[in-house]
Amino acid sequence: SCCVTAGPRASACAVVGGLYWPAMRYTLRRILSLILTPNQAWDEIAREPASVDLLIRRYIVPLALLAPVATVIGMETFDGRWSPAHGYLVPQEAIWSAGATTLFASIISIFVLAGIFVLIAPMYGSSRHYPSALKVATYGAVPVLVAGALLILPVMVMISVVALCHTLYLYWIGVRRVLDVPEEARTEFIGISLTMLGGLSSIIGAALSSAGLF
């Protein structure tokens, strides 16, 4: 590693570490805040400018990688041909494609959910602003995405159920703080959004499967 050598390479490594460590530390602090102090976290998020690029680089892609990587490691290490998402046996030759599908589905689901937020926002007196909607879709999904790291063992799928409950709670807070959805309409807004997401996911999945893509 360049970090344990002397000279220019060590200096370059120190510079890179100095650039990326503060961002990583901020991201980790935000994740912990969403899990432990969600109200405070959403207050901070609501005040921040919406940056699609930042959300993709710091949260969506890195966190979406956790579940497929853990799943592939678990399947390869323990030879347990299992799928935490669907519960069916996965053939050895399909393990990597299953991981890639999980990654693709996780990322696309976040962007689609944000689009659904934007689509139905006017029904609840909220403005259509995709970056803000993506903030809610991304930060709300953090518990489920982080829990994906535990899927190296099949039994840990139970943790995902707990994470899903916390994700629903984060959405319940976030749509009010960031999207200005009326307090009394939050449950309905989230319910409709997730129902639409589930329906679209099923349709897209069936279409891709029939086309032989997955």
Residue ranges and their predicted role:
Residues 2-3, 13:
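Cysteine-centered motifs
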Residues 114-202:
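Hydrophobic alpha-helical transmembrane segments and adjacent short intramembrane/lumenal linkers
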Residues 25-126:
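Selected alpha-helical membrane-embedding segments in polytopic membrane proteins
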Residues 7, 17-18:
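Residue-identity detector for glycine
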Residues 202-214:
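Juxtamembrane boundary at the C-terminal end of a transmembrane helix
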